[in-house]
A protein has these predicted regions:
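Domain-level signature for proteins that mediate thiol-based redox and metal-cofactor handling
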Residues: 1-116
Length: 116
């Protein structure tokens, strides 16, 4: 059973959609279950001003994408390293280790966007 925190982000993600004027975007797939995540960011002076996502995947992947975008906003490129699977899992009410790949895809998409 999913937590209320996860279901809330799954049913009503705040940061889903396109980001006009994005400065970079990254994409990552999850070969285990087929999730595909794209995260677009807008940077200004080394700070992530906005982040938006488009995810085709499970409830965990969508909720994690939304939370990762929220946490990334206001952070520096080097500061986002504090966002990890354990932190996301805890914030979403505890995700079993078998499903952490659903968190890894949006994290990798963010890193891909930051590497460009």
């Amino acid at each position: 059973m999913y937590s209320e925190a996860l279901l809330s982000r799954f049913y009503e993600p705040v940061r889903a959609g396109d980001l006009s004027g994005s400065t970079s975007s990254g994409k990552q797939g999850n070969p285990t279950c087929g999730d595909v995540v794209e995260i677009a960011i807008r940077m200004n002076d080394g700070i992530i001003q906005q982040a938006r996502f488009r995810t085709l995947g499970c409830a965990i992947a969508i909720a994690a994408s939304d939370l990762i975008c929220e946490l990334a906003e206001g952070m520096t490129v080097t500061g986002v390293h504090v966002i990890d699977a354990a932190k996301i899992s805890e914030a979403l009410g505890g995700i079993t280790a078998e499903r952490w790949q659903c968190i890894a895809a949006p994290l990798a998409a963010l890193q891909d966007a930051l590497s460009k």
